[in-house]
Amino acid sequence: MKGEASQVMITLTVDVEEGFHGLWPSARRTMIRYMHELPEGTFVRPLRSILKLFEEEHVRSTFFVLGKIAEAFPEVVEEIHDLGHEVASHGYSHVDLTKISLTELEEMERKNYDRLTKITGEVPRGFRAPFFGINPSIISLLSKIGYVYDSSVVPSLGIPGWWSYHSASLRAHCVSVGEGEFFEVPISVFPYLRLPIGGWFLRNFGVTYVKTAIKWFLSRGIPTIIYVHPFDVDLNAQKLGGTHFYATRRCGKYTLKAMKNLLETFDCQKVPIRDMLEKIMV
């Protein structure tokens, strides 16, 4: 590891998916029930709001793109890449990868790896599993395919519907996968409470909660990894009926302003994960 001063960094990552993909089951069922009323590609407008914010704040970040999104909207993936952001994989389909055979998973993920490479002209380096579901066998497979890091581990307390690893390291670290070198880049959590600080937690717990966690990480020289989704800044999300209020609470302007607040509050590097790894790993 290099000196702590070089590790004062924030990466505000974006999981590029449709709104119904990442919600808790009750909200997801409602979204799917009304999908025939929703135009395909409802993620595009809020995604472009995020891209615009990043341009205004001179921020480059990592976008984990779902394979089905890349398949249907290659021009959107190309747009992300052309703006200087890192394009990484969010898996081909938004399902729990731990419930799929490794043979089927390899076929799916090689397909997405090749597709992202074709669209961007660069091989994707990073991966984030849907629902943060990862295990050593999947890590080995990702390394075999060609990925060099994963950012799926959430070192948090157990949360229903999620994979949680409460005893995992808070720092990016190298993991053993045979002859290759592979890195795990854990998603940042609130200290002591061990709860996530992105997405739903940013919206429901508020920006001060997230800023407190970031200060804790940066004061210890630990790069901070936060995640959001286009859904989190979608102005239409709160119009969806049939879900608990907290599923869509503060989607839209609040979250976009909160992201702007976070980016402007901290005078440190805001970089893609690939760049962060190059800076902190010897």
Which role fits each region the language model picked out?
Residues 1-126, 131-186, 190, 207-282:
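Catalytic alpha-helical scaffold of carbohydrate-active enzymes acting on polysaccharides/glycoconjugates
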Residues 124, 194-204:
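Surface-exposed cleft-lining segments at the edges of enzyme active sites
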